[in-house]
Every structure is written in C-alpha cells, then in structure tokens.
Amino acid sequence: MTTMGDLPGDLVEEILSRVPLTSLRAIRSTCQKWNSLSKSQICGRKATAAENKFLGFMMKDSRVCSMKFDLQGIRNDDGELVEPSIKQVSKLDQIEVSQVFHCDGLVLCIIKDNTGLLVWNPYLGQTRWIHPRNNYQIEDRYALGYDNNRNHKILRIFDLYPSSNRVFGYEVYDFSSNSWKVLDVIPEWDIQSHFRGASLKGNAYFPAQKKETVGGIKTINIEDVLLCFDFTRERFGPPLPLPFHSYNADFFVSLACVREEQLAVLYQRWGAFETIEICVTNKIDPNTVSWSKFLITSTGFPVDTFSGSFFIDEEKKVAVVFDLDRYKPTETCRYQIVYIIGQDEYFKSVNMGVAPNIAKNSYQAYCVPLVCSSSYVPSLVQLQINKPGKRKESN
C-alpha cells in the first residue's frame, strides 16, 4: 500500500508549490518527509519565479492578506492579465493593522489603534506581541531587521516636539532580551512618515532629506539621501546618494526589495504627476550604493501620499504599484487600484474595490493597500507563540 511518504520527491515539491503560504504548517505535519521537503524546497520558489508569479503579503482594508500575482500574460499581444489573488489571513482576522513590514520571512504588523506590534511567522504559524515602552503614534516609522548573529530587532522612529523644531527619537526592540533601548542619535535627516523604507539583508533603508540650521531654525535642505540603519551597530551609516534630486520640491518616494538582493526606488514629483521614475541598485551595502535606471514612464497617475508600495518584474520590465485612485472632490468614495506600468508607456490597471473610509475629514481618511513582500521566502525563526486576539507579555 502506497503512503504519502512513498511519493516521489519531485511530485511532493510540485504539490507544495501549489499550497497557500498560510497552509504550509498543516501540510508539514502530515509526515516527516513532507516536513523536510517543505523546509528545503522553499514554497516552490523556483517554479513560481519561472512562471512570473509573485507570492507575498500585503495590507488591504486594514487586514493582513496573502497575495499571489501572476504576470505571465503581461506584454504579450494575446496575453490576458490574471487578476491578483488576495485572501485575508484567517489566523489574524481579529487584528486591524495600519502598516505592514517584512524581513527574513517575518511580517511586522502595526496595530491600527497604535497600542502594540505583532510579529508573525507565516511558515511556522507563530506570533509574538510586542508592547511599547511608551505610547505609539500614528506617524511612527518602523523597520524590521537583524544583526550579524541573526538576532532580530525592530527600529522605531518617532516624533518629539519639545519646541517648534521637529526632532526625532530612536529606539530598538531586541527579540532576544524582549526589551526596548533608546538610542543616542543626533538626527541630521528628516525621514517623512510617508517615505516608505525597506529591509535588505538585515539592514533597513530609508529615503530622507538632510537638515541644515539657518538662523537657529531647522529647515529641510534640498539634498535627498538614502540612509541605512545597521542593526548590528545600531547606528545609521553615512548618507548615500539617491538617483534623483527634488530641488526642494514636494515629491513622493518609495523603496522596495527585489529578490532579497537589490533595492528599487520609485520617485515622482508632485508637480509632475505624469512622470514616474524607478531605479534599481547595482551595488548596495551600509556604506556604498550605485544605481541604474529601470523605468521612466509618463502614464500620468498621481501616487497617493500614504500609498505607493510596489514591486518590479525585471524580466517583463514592468512595475506593479498599489495605490488609491485619484481624489476627486465630487466623489463620495475612492477605490484601491493596482497600476501596472512598463516600457513604451505600457499601462494597465486593476480595481480592487472600494477603499474603506476609516477616518472622515482626516488626511489619512481612506484605507490604502500596502504590499510588504512580493517574493516571500519562508523562515524558521522561532517566535514565542501567543494568540493574535490576546496580548500577552513576551518572554
């Protein structure tokens, strides 16, 4: 009699490649062989990459969702775009979030009411609540990373207003000690809350603007820089060049990780909505960076201030941008949109539905879609297990 353990390894790998990310825990418990293959096979990553399928996680309607995006038909004359498969994660269905971040197979969820953080390992099905040293704020910036010993940490950047000058505070949460530590950092940069950063190889990167003091008043210089936070040293590295210059104009910028190997940056000046520019790194580490052009398009849609997360397909030469539709004062609702832009002014859009109005008469009134990972790789990092619906102290 043939059992599940008798199936050929290549057949098991094919089966595992078709299993949703959030169901792998149940599959692993079927037999020892399947458990071992699921760890080494990494969710059929090779197969999905060959088929132009992007697997990951995102935030939609204040909920954590798994995402599968198939770009196989893009740029083909007879090809049709398969709409993204977005499914709410049932394990976290009691949790409303305002931001999501990803690093090393872990997902960091910022709770919507700003009362706590939740770290989730989708592969192991484990969660860990993290409690604040003091109150979280709506404009806090976060990053997830790890040091040279693979010890995971969280960076929090928050605003202090002791005077009319804008001042930032910095603190780091250490998973191994279950504690926060305030950093002695004298900020020389302004990291806007709507500037979306990204984690790469354990370090966190942020777009920023250098500060200068004129007549005792701090103002924003016109120099745009990329900052790297080194989780081993728990310090920022030197300011690195970005592949654009805003000339002190208002602009939007967002970072994305490319296959855990490169960074991509999306840039748009608010006075020139018809143009979007995307560049990717040729080389990057905490002290150096070089860039190359990936895409410049004039398809003409303004990226929403608090949205604009994206990923790129290097083979198809397209970018997939998650956004809100353009605001119109006469409309009573807005829609969550996926824009697909490419060379030669290629443009498609997918309507993902009405964006919930979560804060009437607020500058963040509508719930934006945010993608935090498009090339998810499972992690064996152990978290203390606690139920998402109950906030217990972590040991």
Curated annotation (Swiss-Prot):
Reply yes or no: does the keyword Repeat apply: yes
Annotated ranges, domain F-box: 1-47
Mind telling me which SUPFAM superfamilies this protein's record contains? F-box domain, Galactose oxidase, central domain
Residue ranges of Kelch repeats: 154-202, 210-256, 265-314, 337-383
Q: Which UniProt keywords apply?
A: Kelch repeat, Repeat
User: What is the top-level taxon of the source organism?
Assistant: Eukaryota
- Asked if the Swiss-Prot or TrEMBL record annotates the protein with the keyword Protein biosynthesis, the reply is no
NCBIfam families, alphabetically? Answer: F_box_assoc_1 (TIGR01640)
Identification of the protein by name: F-box/kelch-repeat protein At3g13680
| Source organism of the structure | Arabidopsis thaliana (Mouse-ear cress)
